């Protein structure tokens, strides 16, 4: 039953991932799923997905549009798996998580050892088979040796018969010669057969060609025999090589099998060659038959047929001689085969290739025997052919008379045959040359065969000399003059079979541990016990907190050269995907060297689930006296951690600062690099997951990667520093020391050299930039140098290529004017209305003015003229109508200097800050004016007198009814004043004097009192103390001290005390004397001041006239 996997696919920000395809690729076969099959699921726009997944293991691949496929991980669906999200299955612990990397490697090594053991078993079986084949080969070699000897004897007999055949052929040739003489006589009597003789000549040529073919076939047989001799020699060398190969057959069975296959191929080739020899012999036989047939045909020849028969007999004799040589060559080949067979017998103890080589020798011997038999038959056929030719020559004498009567009918045929005969003659010459060359090679081969036969003789063989060798069945002999029999070979084979039985599979190895050590393999028991690597759990030290890093110390047992770099695997636990401490691992080697010459280094693979989840911070090592410890700094929240370490190493997490000689490894560090003492960061995992190494990565071959990041310079040495490939082109940045270039390759040769284009080059010394190709770009700025534009451009119709200046007239640029277009006189009416547009100088008496003429020549207003006088002396314009010219005079253009007439009406008083009156104006000083000359002014001032405004101000006409221009004299508005009198001194006045005198009373009332007795007891009282602060003080000098203590916020009362009495006695002092005041009644006094008056004086104040603050201006008036 399938398990449902569903959820929402989100990115790191929690947003749903869109346009994504989830693929599940089966990694192994299950009950319902076949390996490598693909299943797909497309989440909706909200990222939701739902899949019913069969049991099995799958690789999860995410395909996002526009990005390469991403491998998300591996999930395993079990029969008891619960439904969940894809994240749950990806984050679940797998079998690989439970089995550390080292154990996986152990299992791979076990499999490899098993494969090696299987290979050894196969090699053992092959060796046994090789031994068996060697035994069989030995037996067959002995048999073939006997057969080769028989073949040699047969070949010798064949050679004798061939010699006899040659003698018979020679005798036949003599007879043929005699018959030829008789045929000559017959030819003299047959003069009429000349034309028939031509035909016979053609037939004779054919006979010659056939005889040559026979000779060539015989030569081919000889050549074939020579080839067989060479092959026999090759077989001898192969047999010698087999002897050496047999010695190593037990340890290299595969090589033996290969050699045996090669020998089998050679045997097949020899068989093919023998078959070819047989075919050649049959061809020789056929050619001889053709020769006989041709000789029979010569009966129809005329007198020249006898000569042709004689020639044919000579060729037949040569063929017989060649056949004899062929027989000798066959005998030589047989002898060589006999020798090789003997050598094969010597090497009966050889392994697999020996048997094949012996088989090859047997085949060659049989082929040689067959070839010899064929040669013998061919020789007999050649002798028979020669005899037939001689008989035909004799018969041709009798047949000549009959041929004479047929000469006439043969005349026509003779002409045709003559042409054919010419071509046949040429071919015969070539065949003759080839036959002579073949005969020479046959003689050479025969000579070599004789040399070999004489060398072999019947002497005893040794390791340095060929000959006859004795057989022996001993299996423990060290003799070098005996040959092993099949019995001895079988004993050796049985011994090997017993040692390497196929069904033992290594069970017969006495000391398997020693065997594994010898082949440098690890036993399965060692793998099961995890020998070589230990699995260790390291718990958190006391007091470890999240966010700080704590040392996990991997320590060697001793600092010696026998303990160098150590393999370490350290990892945090598998947690939920959101846990930042999840699955952080380092797998590599560490080497703490302290300050020794061995140095310090580390390298390996670092993994973290996310690049910002750095559970393992770094690896620290001492730079002084500690050459034993490699310290991993781990986040306090990441414990416990798990490690695989080599035997001889220990691992621990100290609970405080670890001090080793001069080095201190800080406990609970925020930044171990700065807080540790006399220790350096060897690997800092701040760059995220990847392969780290503490020193440079140096490779002797290409280095390929997806992206290359660097925090410092990227240094490239050599001529071509950087090659960039895109499409069908390659581009190179090259610095050859003098210049830096951007170079390009030819199309389709992205890894090739650069082409001839030089688009970009910089002089390294001066920085000068050279662009060697066409530049197509939008550039701003100025060029320092330019010679000529590649494509000239037009400026207002004038071509410009940059090589020289150009001149543009006003007409080119449609300009109005650059200088004076022309000069006219004002007295002549100035510039005509239809003059050319431009700026004109118009002269008049004493000065000139500038006139600008705009002439279009079309429309209602065809001309506009404007003129200006110097020093802003006025601006005027006029325009024309159709073709009538100027119909109106100049009109003035008013400016800020020359205001228009409507600025101030005629007659209005205008304040003017100057005594100089502008033209058209007059001062207002009460003067009369000509009302007829200035009618507008007269309308303002009907009296014909301009008011005198000197010293006068202008007052708005009051509502009281005053007339315009009426005057008002000086006046002061009615007002009051306040006054005061000045101070007056009346002097000092006195009253009359009146003395009342002194009045007094008598002094009475003085008296005394007697005093006796005592006072009452009184004065008893208490005191209270409230809100007293607690305090204490010690004081003392020497050995004495006093302590005062006061208690805070407590009320105390003293005891009642102080009651007392007083005794009174004596006389009181005299007292009571006093006086009295006498009152005088209230009264007044009067002082009389006589009648008198006072004078008040008011002083003058003010200006000569009534005025306010003012500035003096002239009043002017516009006249017209």
Curated annotation (Swiss-Prot):
Kindly give the InterPro entries that the UniProt entry links to this protein.
CarboxyPept-like_regulatory, Gp34_trimer, Phage_lambda_Stf-r1, Phage_tail_collar_dom, Phage_tail_collar_dom_sf, Phage_Tail_Fiber_Structural, Stf-like_N
Give residue spans, biased composition: Low complexity.
221-239, 248-395, 402-442
Q: Tell me which UniProt keywords the record has, alphabetically.
A: Repeat
Q: SUPFAM superfamilies in the record, alphabetically?
A: Carboxypeptidase regulatory domain-like, Receptor-binding domain of short tail fibre protein gp12
Annotated region (Disordered) at 129-154, 221-442, 960-1021
Per the record, the domain of life is: Bacteria
UniProt-listed Pfam families:
Collar (PF07484), Gp34_trimer (PF21446), Phage_fiber (PF03335), phage_tail_N (PF08400)
| Ranges of compositional bias, category Polar residues | 985-1021
Q: Name one GO molecular function term.
A: structural molecule activity
- Entry similarity comment: Belongs to the tail fiber family.
PANTHER family in the cross-refs: PROPHAGE SIDE TAIL FIBER PROTEIN HOMOLOG STFQ-RELATED
| Protein name according to UniProt | Prophage side tail fiber protein homolog StfR
């Amino acid at each position: 039953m399938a398990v449902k996997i569903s959820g929402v696919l989100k990115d790191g920000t929690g947003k749903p991932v869109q346009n994504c395809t989830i693929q599940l690729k089966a990694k192994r076969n299950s009950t319902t799923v076949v390996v490598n099959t693909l299943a797909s699921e497309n989440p909706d726009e909200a990222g939701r997905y739902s899949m019913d997944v069969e049991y099995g293991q799958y690789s999860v691949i995410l395909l996002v549009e526009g990005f390469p496929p991403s491998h998300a991980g591996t999930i395993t669906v079990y029969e008891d798996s619960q439904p969940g999200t894809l994240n749950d299955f990806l984050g679940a612990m797998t079998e690989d998580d439970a089995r550390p990397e080292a154990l996986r490697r152990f299992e791979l090594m076990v499999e490899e050892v098993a494969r090696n053991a299987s290979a050894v078993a196969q090699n053992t079986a092959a060796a046994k088979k090789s031994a068996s084949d060697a035994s069989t080969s030995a037996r067959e070699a002995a048999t073939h040796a006997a057969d080769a000897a028989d073949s040699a004897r047969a070949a010798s007999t064949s050679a004798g018969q061939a010699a006899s055949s040659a003698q018979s052929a020679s005798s036949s040739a003599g007879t043929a010669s005699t018959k030829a003489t008789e045929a000559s006589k017959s030819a003299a009597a047959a003069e009429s057969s000349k034309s028939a003789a031509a035909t016979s000549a053609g037939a004779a040529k054919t006979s010659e060609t056939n005889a040559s073919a026979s000779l060539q076939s015989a030569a081919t047989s000889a050549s074939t025999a020579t080839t067989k001799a060479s092959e026999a020699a090759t077989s001898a060398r192969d047999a010698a090589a087999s002897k050496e190969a047999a010695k190593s057959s037990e340890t290299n069975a595969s090589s033996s099998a290969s050699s045996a296959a090669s020998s089998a191929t050679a045997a097949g080739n020899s068989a093919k060659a023998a078959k070819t020899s047989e075919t050649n012999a049959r061809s020789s036989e056929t050619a001889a038959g053709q020769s006989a047939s041709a000789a029979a045909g010569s009966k129809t020849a005329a007198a020249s047929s006898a000569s042709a028969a004689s020639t044919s007999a000579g060729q037949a004799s040569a063929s017989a001689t060649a056949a004899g040589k062929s027989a000798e060559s066959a005998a030589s080949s047989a002898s060589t085969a006999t020798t090789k067979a003997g050598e094969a017998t010597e090497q009966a103890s050889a392994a697999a290739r020996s048997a094949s080589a012996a088989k090859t020798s047997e085949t060659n011997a049989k082929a040689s025997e067959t070839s010899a038999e064929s040669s013998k038959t061919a020789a007999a056929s050649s002798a028979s052919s020669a005899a037939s030719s001689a008989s035909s020559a004799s018969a041709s004498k009798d047949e000549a008379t009959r041929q004479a009567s047929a000469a006439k009918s043969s005349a026509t045929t003779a002409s045709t045959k003559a042409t054919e005969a010419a071509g046949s003659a040429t071919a015969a010459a070539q065949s003759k040359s080839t036959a002579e060359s073949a005969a020479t090679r046959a003689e050479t081969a025969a000579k070599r065969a004789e040399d070999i036969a004489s060398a072999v003789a019947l002497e005893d063989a040794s390791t340095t000399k060929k000959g006859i060798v004795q057989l022996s069945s001993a299996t423990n002999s060290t003799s070098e003059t005996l040959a092993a029999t099949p019995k001895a070979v079988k004993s050796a084979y049985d011994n090997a079979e017993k040692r390497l039985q196929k069904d033992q599979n290594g069970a017969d190895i006495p000391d398997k541990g020693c065997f594994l050590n010898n082949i440098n393999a690890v036993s399965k028991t060692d793998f099961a016990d995890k020998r070589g690597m230990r699995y260790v759990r390291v718990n958190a030290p006391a007091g470890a907190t999240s966010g700080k890093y704590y040392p996990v110390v991997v320590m060697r047992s001793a600092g010696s050269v026998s303990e160098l770099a150590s393999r370490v695997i350290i990892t945090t636990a598998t947690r939920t995907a959101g846990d930042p401490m999840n699955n952080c691992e380092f797998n590599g080697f560490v080497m703490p060297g302290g300050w020794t010459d061995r140095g310090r280094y580390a390298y390996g693979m670092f993994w973290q689930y996310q690049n910002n989840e750095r559970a393992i911070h770094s690896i620290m090592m001492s730079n002084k006296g500690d050459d034993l410890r490699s310290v991993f700094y781990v986040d306090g929240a990441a414990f416990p951690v798990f490690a695989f370490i080599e035997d001889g190493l220990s691992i621990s997490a100290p609970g405080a600062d670890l001090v080793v000689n001069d080095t201190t490894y800080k406990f609970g560090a925020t930044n171990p690099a700065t807080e540790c003492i006399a220790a350096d960061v060897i690997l800092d995992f701040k760059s995220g997951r990847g392969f780290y190494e503490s020193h440079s990565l140096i490779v002797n071959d290409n280095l390929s990667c997806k992206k290359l990041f660097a925090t410092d310079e990227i240094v490239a040495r050599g001529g071509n520093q950087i090659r960039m490939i895109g499409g069908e082109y390659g581009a190179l940045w090259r610095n050859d020391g003098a210049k830096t270039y951007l170079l390009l390759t030819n199309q389709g040769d992205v890894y090739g050299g650069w082409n001839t284009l030089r688009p970009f080059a910089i002089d390294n010394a001066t920085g000068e930039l050279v662009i060697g190709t066409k530049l197509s770009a939008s550039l701003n700025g100025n060029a320092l140098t330019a010679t000529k534009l590649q494509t000239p451009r037009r400026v207002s119709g004038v071509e410009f290529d940059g090589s020289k200046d150009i001149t543009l007239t006003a007409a080119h640029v449609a300009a109005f004017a650059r200088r004076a277009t022309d000069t006219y006189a004002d007295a002549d009416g100035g510039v005509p209305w239809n003059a050319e547009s431009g700026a004109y100088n118009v002269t008049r008496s004493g000065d000139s003015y500038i006139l600008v003429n705009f002439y279009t020549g079309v429309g209602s207003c065809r001309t506009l003229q404007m003129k200006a006088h110097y020093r802003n002396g006025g601006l005027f314009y006029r325009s024309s109508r159709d073709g009538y010219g100027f119909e109106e005079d100049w009109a003035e253009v008013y400016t800020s200097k020359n205001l228009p007439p409507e600025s101030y009406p005629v007659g209005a008083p205008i304040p003017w800050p100057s005594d100089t009156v502008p033209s058209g104006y007059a001062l207002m000083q009460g003067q009369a004016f000509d009302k007829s000359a200035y009618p507008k002014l007269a309308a303002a001032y009907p009296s014909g007198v301009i008011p005198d405004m000197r010293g006068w101000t202008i007052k708005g006409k009051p509502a009281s009814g005053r007339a315009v221009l009426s005057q008002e004299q000086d006046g002061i508005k009615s007002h009051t004043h306040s006054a005061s009198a000045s101070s007056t001194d009346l002097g000092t006045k006195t009253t009359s004097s009146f003395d009342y005198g002194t009045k007094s009373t008598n002094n009475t009332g003085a008296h005394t009192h007697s005093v006796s007795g005592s006072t009452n007891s009184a004065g008893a009282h208490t005191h209270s103390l409230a809100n007293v602060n607690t305090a204490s003080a010690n004081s003392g000098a020497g050995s004495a001290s006093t302590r005062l203590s006061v208690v805070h916020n407590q009320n105390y009362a003293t005891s009642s005390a102080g009651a007392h009495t007083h005794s009174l006695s004596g006389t009181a002092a005299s007292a009571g004397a006093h006086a009295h005041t006498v009152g005088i009644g209230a009264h007044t006094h009067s002082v009389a001041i006589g009648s008198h008056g006072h004078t008040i004086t008011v002083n003058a104040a003010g200006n000569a006239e009534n005025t306010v603050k003012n500035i003096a201006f002239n009043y002017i008036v516009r006249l017209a």
